[in-house]
Amino acid sequence: MVVNKNPVEIVAVIGPKGGVGKTSISANLAISLAQLGKKVVAIDLDLGASNLNTFLGIRSSKYTLDDFILNKVGKLQEIVLETGLENMGFICGGNIPGIANLHYSKKMKLIRNLAMLDYDFVLLDLGAGASYNVVDFVIISQKSLLVTTPEIPSILNTYSFLKTLVFRRLTMALKEFHNQTLLDLLEQARDVEKNPHLKRMDDLVQVIQKIDSSASRLVKQILLGIRPAMILNRIRSGKDEKACVAIENLMRQYLGIECSKILHVHEDASVGHAIAKMKPVMINNPGSVFANDINEIAMFLTG
Amino acid sequence: MSVQVIIYSSDRIRGGILREILRRNKTETLLLDNIMDVKSAISSHKPDIAIFDTSNSLKNEINSLKHLSSSIEECFVMILGDALIINVFHDGNLWNKLFLTDPLDPEIIISKSREILSRIQENRATVKSSDHDSTTAPVIRNIENMEEKPSVADEDIDLVDHNLDIEHLESDLRQYLKLD
């Protein structure tokens, strides 16, 4: 067996709005990474609404995530399926009732197993929304790609997701201080309407500083570490590309975090054609605008 | 106040966005989230356009909207939402209907609204000058042909405060997120 010497890089692909093209991007990005010679496994973690297999053209699967969740297999590696593509494996999503509300112990078991997978990249195709099950997989990932379209509802949901992510991460960290005042403060800061004096992250950090300076240092460190990349999908004009600037400004001012990169994916009819044929765009039309944009994202991930 | 557009949406954010973009386009709008209110508002305000956003609506609300939209003849009806849901509106009277599938595209909605309102104004002026009975139905029927020539609205579409203008977008986001 060839042992992969490099540590696995877990990449979370999130589309908080839903219907923004996240799964299409995940499927094709996994192929692009594999074509760059990276060993990749794409995992459908859109729990309860999985369909990554259809974007990869996989009609049936011997194993799914259900087998792992229901303890029918011991290790996640055992349910990795062949895709027929060199360097690329796939784990089909589960659809057992209640899987979307994955129990904490199951989630932890899954997270432990993700880190043990023998791949260069583990690509997680996560569900829409901002449930803790989605947020926690983003927290354990080395890189996260937030997919949005230029429309306001999608941008709003992306911001809300980021806010949930930031507060979830800060709550986890501040719990270690066993200081209820700090946790109460975080709770207050979530509600900017009732507590406008805490609406900016700088304001919150200053108040934390007065309570416990080491806690404020930790908060700053955590915020520096949250650097999602944003994928602006379905761009139709040069003006569409500006949509991310607004959310970046809000992220900086109110959440105290920065984007690591803004990546563009242009509107392209080849996506619809490929989906209709149940074939990935990277295979069906590798010279398309969409395929080129996906290759750019893969290049960003591989550094 | 003369209401030109009545919006129904049970999705607070989408409804708010629709109202805001139309308001900025100097269009008098009324946003409602109750179908019974929409019905009475249409008969009392006699708007030029009714926008039915089906997003987030329950099955019985979709049925009521379908019933209501098929009975409306006095104004233009724009139906927004998921393609699968919009399909149920496709039978019956289609001459005064426009279907726009998700994702919600403010630019298209503004463009179409301006086009419809402009045509209605034109037709009203024509009907008035020829001293004919100015019932709304013939005015609306002329809109069926509106794709034939470009409207003035298309020429300055870039001026529409769509989410592409960063300052406006940021201001909208602040408002919806209650950060102001």
Feature-to-residue mapping (PLM):
Chain A
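Intrinsically disordered, low-complexity acidic Ser/Thr-rich regulatory segments
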Residues: M201-V245, Y254
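Conserved nucleotide-binding/hydrolysis micro-motifs of P-loop NTPases
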Residues: L47-A49, I96-G98, G129, E151-S154, ...
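Conserved C-terminal guanine-recognition region of P-loop GTPase G domains, centered on the G4
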Residues: I155-L170
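Beta-strand-loop-alpha "switch" segments that mediate conformational coupling across diverse proteins
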Residues: G225, L232-R234, R252-V281
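P-loop/Walker-type NTP enzyme "switch/lid" segment
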Residues: L45-D120, E176-F177, L183-P196, Q209-I211, ...
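NTP-binding/hydrolysis catalytic cores, primarily Walker-type P-loop NTPases
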Residues: E258, G272, A276-G303
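Walker A/P-loop phosphate-binding motif and the immediately C-terminal alpha-helix
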Residues: V3-D46
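Inter-motif core of Ras-like GTPase G domains
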Residues: N133-P153
